[in-house]
């Protein structure tokens, strides 16, 4: 199979939405019957985002094969059916690490290691490898043209443009076309300068995606075409919309996919966007609203919980309700108590690391349990629910996790020292292990308890979900917790690790050690999120009757 490559760059400012634009184009091409994948090349020096602060970088998206990747890969999986893996995201840090490892082994036979050709060759090899087996590979270059960090990546794709030729490569550049209220018009000069910067390093864009808060007038598109040396039909206006799931149709209406298909000489059907039309219709026509309180520690940057946010919206689509997320700092719960938890239809406690705010999360779990309020715990959200139950129901007053209190008399949650991975291999860790890449990561099989809410949600006796954690339920306390009424509704493939817990006599109190948000999509949703939002809607209706 001959793979075609579309390289996506950004100019003027960051956060223009390159990832969404790339994913939307991929969705249209997939709707035409093409096999599409997307890669993200990140210019930062970290080997991966695994140890980066969520408040700086946003969430870490975990792939099926256990790679800790950029949150844009979450967008990719939500827009197309192709599953991402570790080949779909790499950083400057990883490239340099691999090149230096080869140099230490003597693979370069004593050569002087340089950015060109050694670093650029390594980048090109990864791009080609990531695209193998697909009709089209869309490659997003992180950062903004003009940043010094991005230069090795830009040089690499310039070389690929020459080596593969025009019939296998296309360069798409996103720019900002701002509207100046004082002048009453949009300004094209930033786009002209951005294209000039890109051309100065040898890349001539074939397509311009012009971002702005409004559609670009026809005369301004003609002006951009003239000054940037791009066909007028390849100047695409991408205005702000109230839903990112409208963007595939917006790009399709301007013929972007036709331009790509013609350029590459691909034979394929017309795009069928009926699934996306259904998503947009459901989003625009809810029959009600539920308010979900998300109790976390990274709430100052909602992107820290990007996949959770999207999964809740997807569940709303399936339940025909709009979901309003109320972000609640867990430290505020510690300071103000239950008053900040009033007026909610459900509580969700997402994953996280570190002691800050953990008691507020425990308090939120207690509030949900005692008030029959739907509760959904994810990763740490499961652990705090178990700690709360151990303290207040099972008679272990000072129960805790050894992550937060190594001296606790009841370490109901502790460091996992050994587990079996998805291929049956035994993984081992200890306290001194590096933080990066040492967690239980990736897709794992979970056996579900017959008759449990978990089994009902999944409509079966097993599921496969992605993990990212170091701590687990301490098996020493399983029997005591079960006797007190806690249900262990999900166990690992070897049945040695607790994957899910729930409460019997509660409308919906379910928690999982894994991250189900990573597999939720707008077209398919996710059974646990759907069950949670359905329970929240039912709780609201019961309250209204009262």
Swiss-Prot record:
Q: Which InterPro entries match?
A: Class_I_gatase-like, CTP_synthase, CTP_synthase_N, GATASE, GATase1_CTP_Synthase, P-loop_NTPase
Any one GO molecular-function label of the UniProt entry: identical protein binding
Biological process annotations from GO = 'de novo' CTP biosynthetic process; pyrimidine nucleobase biosynthetic process
Residues annotated as catalytic = 379 (nucleophile), 515, 517
Q: Where is this region: Amidoligase domain?
A: 1-266
Residue positions binding L-glutamine = 352, 380-383, 403, 470
- Which CDD domains does the protein's record reference? CTPS_N, GATase1_CTP_Synthase
Keywords noted in UniProt:
ATP-binding, Glutamine amidotransferase, Ligase, Magnesium, Metal-binding, Nucleotide-binding, Pyrimidine biosynthesis
| Binding residues for UTP | 14, 187-192, 223
Stated EC number for the protein is 6.3.4.2
- Described purpose of this protein according to its UniProt entry: Catalyzes the ATP-dependent amination of UTP to CTP with either L-glutamine or ammonia as the source of nitrogen. Regulates intracellular CTP levels through interactions with the four ribonucleotide triphosphates.
Query: Which PANTHER family does the UniProt record give?
Result: CTP SYNTHASE, CTP SYNTHASE-RELATED
HAMAP family recorded: PyrG
Q: What is the official name of this protein in its record? A: CTP synthase
Q: Which gene encodes it?
A: pyrG
């Amino acid at each position: 199979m001959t793979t075609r490559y579309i390289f996506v760059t950004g100019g003027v400012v960051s956060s223009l939405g390159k990832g969404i634009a790339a994913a939307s184009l991929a969705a249209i091409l997939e709707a035409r019957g093409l096999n599409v994948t997307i890669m993200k090349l990140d210019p930062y020096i970290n080997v991966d985002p695994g140890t980066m602060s969520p408040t700086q970088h946003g969430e870490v998206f975990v792939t099926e094969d256990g790679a800790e990747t950029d949150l844009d890969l979450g967008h990719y999986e939500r827009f197309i059916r192709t599953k991402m893996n570790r080949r779909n995201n790499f950083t400057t840090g990883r490239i340099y690490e691999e090149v230096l490892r080869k140099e230490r082994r003597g693979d370069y036979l004593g050569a002087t290691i340089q950015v060109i050709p050694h670093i650029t060759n390594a980048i090109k090899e990864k791009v080609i490898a990531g695209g193998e087996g697909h009709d089209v590979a869309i490659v997003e270059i992180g950062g903004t043209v003009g940043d010094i960090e991005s230069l090795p990546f830009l040089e690499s794709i310039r070389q690929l443009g020459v080596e593969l030729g025009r019939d296998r490569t296309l360069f798409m550049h996103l720019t900002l076309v701002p509207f100046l209220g004082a002048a009453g018009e949009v300004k094209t000069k930033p786009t002209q300068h951005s294209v000039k910067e890109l051309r100065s390093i040898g890349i001539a864009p074939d397509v311009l995606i012009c971002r702005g808060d409004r559609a670009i007038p026809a005369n301004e598109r003609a002006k951009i075409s003239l000054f940037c040396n791009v066909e007028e039909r390849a100047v695409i206006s991408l205005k702000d919309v109230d839903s990112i799931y409208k963007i595939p149709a917006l790009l399709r209406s301007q013929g972007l996919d036709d331009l790509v298909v013609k350029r590459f000489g691909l034979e394929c059907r017309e795009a069928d966007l009926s699934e996306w039309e259904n998503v947009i219709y459901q989003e625009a026509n809810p029959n009600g609203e539920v308010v979900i309180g998300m109790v976390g520690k990274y709430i100052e940057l909602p992107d820290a919980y990007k996949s959770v946010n999207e999964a809740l919206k997807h569940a709303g689509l399936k339940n025909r309700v709009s979901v309003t997320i109320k972000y609640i700092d867990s430290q505020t719960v510690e300071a103000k108590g239950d008053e900040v938890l009033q007026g909610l239809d459900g509580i969700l406690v997402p994953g996280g690391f570190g002691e800050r705010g953990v008691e507020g999360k425990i308090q939120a779990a207690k509030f949900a349990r005692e008030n029959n309020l739907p509760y959904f715990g994810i990763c740490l959200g499961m652990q705090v629910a178990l700690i709360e139950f151990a303290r207040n129901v099972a008679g272990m007053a000072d129960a805790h996790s050894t992550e937060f209190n190594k001296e606790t008399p009841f370490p109901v949650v502790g460091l996992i020292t050994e587990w079996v991975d998805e291929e049956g291999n035994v993984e081992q860790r200890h306290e001194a292990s590096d933080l990066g890449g040492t967690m239980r990561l990736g897709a794992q099989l979970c056996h579900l308890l017959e008759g449990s809410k978990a089994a009902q949600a999944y409509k079966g006796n097993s599921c496969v979900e992605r993990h990212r954690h170091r701590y687990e339920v301490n098996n020493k306390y399983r029997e005591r917790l079960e006797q007190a009424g806690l249900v262990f509704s999900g166990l690992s493939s070897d049945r040695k690790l607790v994957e899910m817990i729930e409460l019997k006599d509660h409308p919906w109190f379910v928690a999982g050690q894994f991250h189900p948000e990573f597999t939720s999509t707008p077209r398919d949703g996710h059974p646990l999120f759907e069950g949670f939002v359905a329970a929240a809607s039912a709780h609201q209706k019961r309250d209204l009757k009262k």
